[in-house]
């Protein structure tokens, strides 16, 4: 092993540092366990303020191990520091091997408590409870040295009670895997969301409307405290084919003078994840040089032209281009809107998808680049 590699192995990451912690203070603390070669607090390039983490390089690997064993979660300037081996192997960090995701954590569980609960299953490379100014966000990550330790932790801890909360413990999924899972759910849905049908609808009538597309497992019109319809509801089919056919044939259909919206039903967490995924894609489009963020608008009423479409969407932000596609002077029923920022496009899509414009409910998606 060459000298540089040896010193890399004796390097520790020090996280969750107080903004006032200095290199001198860290040197005095860590040199009590053995000779320290160097310490670097990472700082903002412009303001030179601490970013809250540092790297400590020891002369001896054994001293780095001793510091990790005896100083992890020590208090410096009122904050508990978090130590782990400095991991310069990008593949190991990103591969997901040995990485575990934990959610539904009690707010009182901190980094130290998390480490204590999971270190019994194997050597931990890193662990962190995610938090903001209000404290714990209720989820965390633990990265084990190998997958077998991670599998033991999942088998033993998933569904167990920690501080009164039943926690979920599972394999960490990277963004590509999460996006693939979302696409799979979207392509195999069986639950349908219906809105805009007014206050006269009930469960039986809604079932009569949708049962012709396939066997229904449940039908529910949402009601207020007086039992009156809130104008939206859900139908659960026993097959994806039936649900898909219902969406295709009923979206935009007139029921008792009301143009209804019919689409895939999503849980709140799925909607949030899908919106977050779309927002990240929008940002990537901008980074790749797109002059704007394009939304594809379908199911346009024949009376909607460029000006009317712009007027309907202008409240969401700066629009650089609007185009309703036409053939021989007649609308083809779809168009494009180019916003100047991902934030504006995301807001427009969230607010306007399914909204009645003219006589039809809009269908909005991110315009794909080819």
From Swiss-Prot:
Record domain RRM: where: 10-88, 98-174, 190-267, 293-369
Record's GO cellular component terms: cytoplasmic stress granule; cytosol; nucleus; ribonucleoprotein complex
Keyword terms: Repeat, RNA-binding
GO molecular function, one term: poly(A) binding
CDD domains tied to this protein: RRM1_I_PABPs, RRM2_I_PABPs, RRM3_I_PABPs, RRM4_I_PABPs
Family as reported in the entry's similarity comment: Belongs to the polyadenylate-binding protein type-1 family.
Role this protein plays: May bind RNA.
UniProt name for this protein: Polyadenylate-binding protein 4-like
Organism per entry: Homo sapiens (Human)
